[in-house]
Amino acid sequence: YTKFSYPKSISVKLTSKELKNENYIKILIPHLKTEIPLFVVFKALGCISDREICEYIIDNNKTELDNELLKLLRKSIEDASHICTQIDALTYMTTYLNSTNYYSYETDITTKIKYIKNIVIKDTFPHVGDKYINKCNYLGLTVNKLLKHHLGIYDLDDRDSYINKRVETCGILIGNLLFQSI
């Protein structure tokens, strides 16, 4: 028995207000109708302290670059300052469930939290595995690259390069053909 499904996509966005030098980092997760602040997602993954989250993102070389990265993260830290526990983060995320979803009509908060936990485990970086620490490491690496590109240290990835292409095996391609014909 083989299960075929569409690729899950997550986007990490860095937005800024032009007049102020404030940078917001937000993440768009499947089944949620709006972008969630970065530190809320980290807290939903089990990283509670802001220091621990910053250690996942920053290289910790004690260089000037670390200070620049911290300056870029300041507004994101402030966005999630009212979230103190993992349950608080999951409860915050339940308010943004898609209205087309069955669980958005549930009134029981524990059912919604279980559903959000399932989204965090299964739909957030599914290629990394089910362990929260692996997801935190990957999210930290992604945000690190985003911030370094914003500072001009990294260039954009070449989307046309074969290094950045997804290679689909013959089984997945046949499954996609069968799924399209249904």
Locate the predicted segments by residue.
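N-terminal non-catalytic structural scaffold regions of very large proteins
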Residues: Y1-I182
